[in-house]
Regions:
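Conserved PLP cofactor-binding pocket of PLP-dependent enzymes
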Residues: 1-5, 48, 52-53, 90-125, ...
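Generic alpha-helical structural context detector
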Residues: 25-30, 51, 77, 93, ...
Length: 160
């Protein structure tokens, strides 16, 4: 077995690392010129996912509000484990076996050891954050993917 796709790192201390190299800065400047195109491509593929995945009753899809433009840094779904064929983690492992990289959609900050100890929190203190932590799943959405990649991901999700 390889790494577990559902395992996110825990953080034991608060810290910041905002340093950027000159090379990263130069690449960033070039990328900014492509930003609108990147965002438009991601929005189109997010709409494709929403259309293609809406028939899967155990997936809660992100809403698309036409009143504003979002960046689509990721495409995060929520797995309803009361309806799904397997748990979110098992689904992520099955997708990994089929070559599809997924990750949990978010951390529940109150479940990270640093904050848990600092604020004396319990996992059940924030039920919706816990649900998002345990049941969210980010599926691939990036600008190097092609139509066949998206079709394959949809096909594999529908086959579960």
């Amino acid at each position: 077995h390889g790494p577990r796709p559902y395992s996110l790192p825990d953080f034991n201390m608060l810290g910041f690392n905002y340093r950027m190299t000159d090379l990263q800065g130069a690449v960033g400047v070039v990328q900014m010129g492509k930003l609108d195109t990147f965002i438009d491509e991601r929005a189109n593929w997010a709409a494709y996912y929403n259309d293609q995945l809406k028939s899967i009753d155990w997936l809660e899809l992100p809403s698309i509000n036409t009143n504003y433009k979002r960046g689509w840094q990721s495409y995060v779904v929520l797995v309803d484990e009361s309806k799904s064929p397997k748990s979110r983690n098992e689904i992520m492992e099955l997708l990994q076996e089929k070559g599809i990289s997924t990750r949990p959609g978010t951390h529940a900050v109150h479940m990270l050891n640093y904050y848990k100890e600092l604020m004396e929190l319990n996992d059940d203190d924030f039920s919706q954050a816990k649900l998002a932590n345990n049941c969210s799943m980010a599926i691939p959405l990036h600008n190097r993917m092609v139509e066949e990649d998206y079709e394959y991901i949809v096909k594999m999700l529908k086959s579960l």
